[in-house]
């Protein structure tokens, strides 16, 4: 254990990449507890400004001088080994911790850690559960991978023993955590730049299950075949949920005019209560069931669970209504995996519209390549597809895969699809082609949301 929440109170902790959503949240938690915090990032942003206003020393750019007087340095997986601050820390024998290790050590300071894992839906479910926990007045500390209006950001510091966070499987980060309640929302093939195959991913989730103590809880989507194959690994209390099976089920589902589900929550064939969602799609019914199960396992009152679920209107970049222009609706979603895109388009299909334009920006070359066949089959609910270039993120273009190749395959399948290389060209195309009553859906984990903002702000 390199970091101790109590013993290290007087330490100076430096974050490399402090502008990231998770790193900034960790820094903010420590600032609340009066740690000395500094951090560097390549660009200033509203996040770095917020941290500076709270007392952090912020450096723009990475230089060895930035880590002066630091006792511990936390870095993300995106930071290269030749980063000058990393090199300087090694030369001066300053302790280095990666973000997941640090978060794991931080969790040791809490008794009731709730870790939300799964290939899809982590941010939404963590946010939804946060609403429930706040309604139940358990005063949780919250660390979420998106901006949540109810906490005015991505982090909340509470005074109780409850800690709610996402648990990402990328690079097995979630295996460094200490969940008392661990949720698995789904298991799908993703991050194949790190994992060998789906079995390798399932093996990581099996290890995650084993982290939960005997008196803790595994909350799992019981209708997911990949979860079914590993749930036997649990040596703790298990609560499953689903539409047609599971300990907690959703019955009598109806959708309103905005595709939001209303349903009865059933346990042992007995109705517990009814709930009305304010987020669309079947996938959000499942996300809400996971939140309900965790609430019940945490002995929260049903009325608080209902109020928490029904007060949740989504997070930024998760089927987020960006606005309307000339009676044309613009919605943005973070979906970047074929399963997520299918779920998002299914929800959009139920949303009032004439024609549905899906503006998609593939995220990373490795994901586009390894899941290429799946990407060719997930856009069928769109009336027209517009493809931007691949968002590289942490990767380099090797020339093996491109958005044009995906576009060719979609056109071969008879789908109306157009490729563009510039956001301005996409905006102009939408100006010319989107008509009264149409729906524009921007999709992807990169910066494709800018297209919708450009269109609305004309």
Curated annotation (Swiss-Prot):
Gene3D superfamilies referenced in this protein's UniProt entry, alphabetically: Mur ligase, C-terminal domain (3.90.190.20), Mur-like, catalytic domain (3.40.1190.10), NAD(P)-binding Rossmann-like Domain (3.40.50.720)
A GO BP annotation: cell division
Cellular component terms per the entry's GO annotation: cytoplasm
Top-rank lineage group of the source organism: Bacteria
Listed GO MF terms: ATP binding; UDP-N-acetylmuramate-L-alanine ligase activity
EC number: 6.3.2.8
Chain positions recorded as ATP binding sites: 118-124
Cell compartment(s), UniProt: Cytoplasm
Catalytic activity of the protein: UDP-N-acetyl-alpha-D-muramate + L-alanine + ATP = UDP-N-acetyl-alpha-D-muramoyl-L-alanine + ADP + phosphate + H(+)
Keywords, comma-separated and alphabetical: ATP-binding, Cell cycle, Cell division, Cell shape, Cell wall biogenesis/degradation, Cytoplasm, Ligase, Nucleotide-binding, Peptidoglycan synthesis
The keyword Cell wall biogenesis/degradation is annotated on this UniProt entry: yes
Chief localization: cytoplasm
Keyword field contains Protease: no
Pfam families tied to this protein: Mur_ligase, Mur_ligase_C, Mur_ligase_M
InterPro entries named among the record's database cross-references: Mur-like_cat_sf, Mur_ligase_C, Mur_ligase_C_dom_sf, Mur_ligase_cen, Mur_ligase_N, MurCDEF_pg_biosynth, UDP-N-AcMur_Ala_ligase_MurC
Top EC category: ligase
Pathway where this protein functions: Cell wall biogenesis; peptidoglycan biosynthesis
Family in the record: Belongs to the MurCDEF family.
NCBIfam families: murC (TIGR01082)
Function: Cell wall formation.
This protein's name: UDP-N-acetylmuramate--L-alanine ligase
Species this protein is from: Clostridium botulinum (strain Kyoto / Type A2)
Lineage, uppermost ranks: Bacteria, Bacillati, Bacillota, Clostridia, Eubacteriales
